[in-house]
Amino acid sequence: MSTAEQKTETKNPAERSTADVTLDYPIARSGQKITKLTLRKPKAGTLHGLSLTALMQMQADEVMVLLPRIVEPTLLEKEVRDLEPSDMLQCAMEVATFLAPKAVLGYPIESKA
């Protein structure tokens, strides 16, 4: 494992701007297989029209609306709905981690003063 990979793995989850999800069940698209998704930490505008409570509770319907907005490669709505439950859960867990305050994740809040 390279030093860069080690730094990425040990980085405070509250400070990550992306998260990689390796799919248990790859997505077939045009003769190719998508085996990994990269989720971007959503900004407030990306969450427009969504319930933060539902996202933190990892409610599938709410997560399915958010995923196409934050995932690379971009997924179609049908592809998101066809995700296997284990893959959906991995994505939902990353979303919840993105939204959780640092204090909830057990990391101290650094003072800027």
For each predicted feature, which ranges?
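Short, surface-exposed, charged amphipathic helix/loop patches that serve as local interaction elements
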Residues: 2-113
